[in-house]
């Protein structure tokens, strides 16, 4: 599958495909993963600069997190195609591996992003002693995307579906083994509608508005 080309300056560069699952060649996946790793390394080096303005630090940090997720998707595809399993490789790839504020989500802060107003204080604070309501407000101040709420990209949906099918089969077997111990009026839980991306964005927008209002009042 050929990819489109774009030009940065005078050097033509191959644009990585968005539909990672459509790439069925391990060498091509490896090439794109290497490209992502190179982009991450450059941005991690840049975010260490003492001359960067605050808005560029935030944009760079967001970009690094997006690239980290893309790297993970390529590694999943490489593994599924029978290539190297990078997911179990704990070798350090980057000079800065980033830090999480808490285990609530996987968003990481790199370089000078850890010194941003509000972020630095959160790293210094012991989040376990902050009341739940205040902790939620602090998390809402960040740019949360669908990943934060557990909505995975289409490229990984098949993996989740396979996992859910396996768990569902195990649960059915478990219930069959229980026999008469299962209550007669037991009914399976039916989820009629899963939120769309637009629904998630609307929820996030509403939460941001509420967070701003709580800070103003």
Curated annotation (Swiss-Prot):
GO terms for cellular component: catalytic step 2 spliceosome; cytosol; nucleus; post-mRNA release spliceosomal complex; post-spliceosomal complex; Prp19 complex; spliceosomal complex; U2-type post-mRNA release spliceosomal complex. Disulfide bonds: none annotated. Keywords: Cytoplasm, mRNA processing, mRNA splicing, Nucleus, Spliceosome. One of its GO terms (biological process) is mRNA cis splicing, via spliceosome. It is found in: Cytoplasm; Nucleus. Its main location: cytoplasm. Belongs to the ISY1 family. Involved in pre-mRNA splicing and cell cycle control. This is Pre-mRNA-splicing factor cwf12.
